[in-house]
């Protein structure tokens, strides 16, 4: 039960009405006025009862608030700080432990790695144990290993870091080797992958046949017999001619390459770039080295129009003719050349026909020519 301090404050007595005047002095009220007075009385009574109820509610509310004031007046920030600090304390410990574990793991990892590296370089695993070769066809594997200068038993990684140097040693010693790639094979061994140039032709010399590589280089080694399927190059005495020829030859279609049996260097007095290309079908092509790849592309069309084997002249234009015509032209050219070369010089003092090359000394053949001329 809540204690009410002053009942008079809550339940106020209604003020006394002013003394009524005597009935004689007051006029008689009409029915309407009587009803109005009764209505006003009811309104006043209702207002008084309503005010008393509101005052009681306000008093009860104030008493409840007075009991709650000790708790409400406590500093809110202090309570919140105590709660937050208590909640954060376990998290702070966990974070510190995680950092310590991470640092410890990092230190142990670095230390363990350093120990393993030191043990590796001390062990035989850090030394080259074996070298193998693959892809070689023309050069023996042992010769490649020896010329590479790789040393088994020496440091593996030191030699691997200088692998370009060892590859260059191989290519320098063996021109046929196009590329030598040194790579790791297993834990402590090397593998040398070899790529060789193709032998595309043979250079004919007095001592035999020298292989000609696709890059135009001629190997020093010789073979007594010509390899089948490879064209033979003849009369190429100058070293620069074969690389120039190979630059054009490599551009030819494979069908044309397979149809070539021999290429001879045949310069004329006016053209030092001429070659004769002998085909397997019996034809002979006269063409410039610089025009070989361009004009030989039309050879198949020209050969189909020829009735029998002959000559395809591609020096200036492109035309063909049989071998008989060449023999006739060659005979006339030879007779003209011999007449010019055998032209006689007459010595007026001696009265004898002499050859300028013999310094005025007549020969039996010259005497016969002089007599015939007379």
Swiss-Prot record:
TM regions (residue ranges): 104-124
Subcellular location: Cell membrane
Pfam families membership: FtsQ_DivIB_C, POTRA_1
Keywords from the named record: Cell cycle, Cell division, Cell membrane, Membrane, Transmembrane, Transmembrane helix
Role noted for this protein: Cell division protein that may be involved in stabilizing or promoting the assembly of the division complex.
Sequence segments annotated as region (Disordered): 1-90, 325-374
GO CC term, one of those recorded: cell division site
The family this protein is said to belong to: Belongs to the FtsQ/DivIB family. DivIB subfamily.
Species: Enterococcus faecalis (strain 62)
Listed name of the protein: Cell division protein DivIB
GO biological process, one term: FtsZ-dependent cytokinesis
Extracellular side: 125-374
POTRA domain boundaries: 126-197
Entries under InterPro entries matching the protein: Cell_div_FtsQ/DivIB_C, DivIB, FtsQ_DivIB, POTRA, POTRA_FtsQ_type
Biased composition regions of type Polar residues, renumbered to the chain: 56-75, 356-374
Listed Basic and acidic residues bias regions: 39-53
Entry membrane topology: Single-pass type II membrane protein
Keyword Thylakoid found: no
């Amino acid at each position: 039960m809540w204690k009410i301090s002053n009942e008079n404050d809550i339940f106020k007595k209604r003020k006394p009405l002013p003394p009524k005047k005597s009935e004689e002095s007051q006029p008689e009220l009409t029915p309407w006025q009587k009803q109005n007075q009764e209505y006003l009385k009811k309104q006043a009574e209702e207002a008084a009862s309503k005010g008393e109820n509101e005052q009681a509610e306000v008093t009860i509310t104030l008493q409840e608030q007075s009991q709650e004031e000790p708790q409400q007046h406590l500093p809110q920030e202090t309570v919140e700080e105590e709660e937050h600090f208590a909640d954060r304390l376990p998290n702070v410990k966990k974070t510190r432990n995680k950092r310590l574990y991470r640092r410890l793991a990092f230190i142990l990892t670095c230390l363990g790695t350093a120990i393993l590296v030191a043990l590796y370089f001390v062990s035989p695993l850090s030394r080259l144990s074996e070298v193998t070769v693959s892809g070689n066809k023309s050069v023996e594997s042992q010769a490649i290993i020896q010329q590479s200068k790789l040393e088994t038993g020496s440091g593996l990684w030191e030699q691997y870091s200088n692998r370009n140097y060892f590859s260059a040693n191989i290519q320098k010693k063996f021109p046929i080797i196009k590329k030598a790639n040194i790579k790791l094979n297993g834990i402590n061994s090397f593998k040398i992958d070899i790529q060789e140039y193709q032998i595309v032709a043979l250079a004919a010399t007095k001592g035999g046949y020298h292989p000609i590589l696709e890059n135009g280089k001629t190997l020093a080694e010789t073979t007594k017999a010509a390899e089948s399927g490879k064209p033979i190059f003849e009369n190429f005495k100058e070293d620069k001619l074969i690389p120039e020829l190979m630059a054009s030859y490599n551009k030819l279609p494979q069908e044309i390459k397979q149809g070539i049996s021999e290429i001879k260097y045949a310069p004329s007095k006016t053209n030092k770039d001429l070659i004769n290309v002998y085909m397997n079908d019996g034809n002979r092509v006269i063409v410039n080295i610089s025009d070989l790849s361009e004009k030989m592309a039309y050879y198949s069309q020209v050969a189909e129009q020829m009735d029998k084997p002959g000559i395809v002249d591609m020096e200036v234009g492109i035309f063909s003719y049989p071998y008989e015509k060449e023999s006739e032209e060659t005979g006339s050219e030879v007779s003209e050349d011999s007449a010019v070369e055998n032209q006689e010089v007459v010595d007026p003092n001696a009265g004898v026909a002499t050859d300028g090359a013999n310094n005025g000394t007549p020969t039996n053949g010259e005497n016969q020519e002089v007599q015939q001329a007379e």
